[in-house]
Amino acid sequence: MRIGFDNEKYIKLQAEHIRERIGQFGGKLYLEFGGKLFDDYHASRVLPGFAPDAKISMLKSLIDEVEIVIAINANDIEKSKVRGDLGITYDEDVLRLMDIFRSMGFMVGNVVITQYANQPDADAFRKRLTSMGITSYLHYPIAGYPYDIDRIVSDEGYGKNEFIETSRPLVVVTAPGPGSGKMATCLSQLYHENKRGVAAGYAKYETFPIWNLPLNHPVNIAYEAATVDLDDDNIIDPFHLEAYGETTVNYNRDVEIFPVLKSMMERIQGESPYKSPTDMGVNMAGMAIVDDEACREAAEMEIVRRYFQTAVELKRTGVGEKWLAKLEMLMNRASVNVNLSPARSAALLKEETTGAPAGAMQLPDGTVVTGKTGPLLGAASALLMNALKGVSGVDDKLDVISDEVLEPICHLKTEHLKSQNPRLHSDETLLALSISSVTNPIAEQLIDNADKLRGCDAYFSVIISSTDEKLYRTLGINVCCEPKYEQHRYYHK
């Protein structure tokens, strides 16, 4: 992988900048933490060299100065809102986050339940927190929010909210997902701190869009592609342009709410420390890009991946037609198309010549390998085997797993487990490869080289099974599928 981002430089710069911002406000900063704190694979894909855990590593460098508050919207508890990427409810994710933070040595003990209006499930969750020894606080709906500044910044607004007791100079406010009330929590705390005579400030930390990259830089376009379902648009920050004569990039929701936010801060603190939404941010990611072309190429690939993901989701659910149209527009803006990766045309050609579903993958050295549907292995399994051979320097015609190993597994599937598909999925193929490695050193070599496939792009001529897709993602392989099924059925796993 061609490195375009200096992760160590980023961690150092980011920590220094946050410390500067703490000092700017007299020693106390409420930092709204947007996006993913850990496992930020989008950032690692579009900024090659960015570690998925870079943000949490940066926070660990400030560990003695930071404490964490987790916000959750009472309405999300009531609706049992689920995190799509994890398949767990927001309230369960609060507990998961607390476990992770604590295991890393962070000070985390406070949960704030926002938009609380006596929701029964929120009451039950609070009782559960109390039984675990976790302190929780209630923040209430405010009539006229966010535009009725007089009411909001008063004893009838933020004044009604419970003050969250904190002791460290940096208070990171995070949440299971968007709409949890992170910003409102920070501003409510500023109101209460100010009434107590404590100097404190607010800032926002989000990786994307990167404010000091051009509006139409592929990295920023890739952010729009990733959030296409949120209707986020990157725009030039007009407030920053007017105040400083500098062109910077922000997203539409932050720009739209800035005049209101500025008025709130003026009311709370007497004056606003910020002249623009860009001023509010602390993101230093743009300063750590060391190879712009590498980041451009990586981001272009991500835009195309998002297109295929959305096209497949539209085929599966019937939802997302307008999102797909927007992604086509974003691809045009980035001057890329669906054939950006040579693996796609290779997969389609393989299907055309064999008359059955096929796949292709571009390996780290740029070579493209293919996999076809056979009597014992599906396309995903065949491609995985050929890719492992490719990165291991093994002849792709060599049968590393003998039919004597494969056939009993296929027999078990069809005769005893009553599967209609005798072919092995990719996870089953890896197990067969593992069994073979006991007596076959080449099989062991293939397993040892599996990590070399991380970051590769695989394309399939049909939508592959969820089992195969999950295994590929576990190996760190990016998967794109043509939006069509192998068989015409109403139900697909």
Q: Can you say where each PLM-predicted feature lies in the sequence?
A:
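Short clusters of small/polar residues that mark proteolytic maturation junctions
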Residues: 372-373
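A short, polar/charged loop-to-alpha-helix boundary motif
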Residues: 376-392
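The conserved Walker
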Residues: 177-178
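Flexible phosphate-sensing "switch/lid" loops adjacent to ATP/NTP-binding sites
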Residues: 1-173, 189-351, 356, 363-365, ...
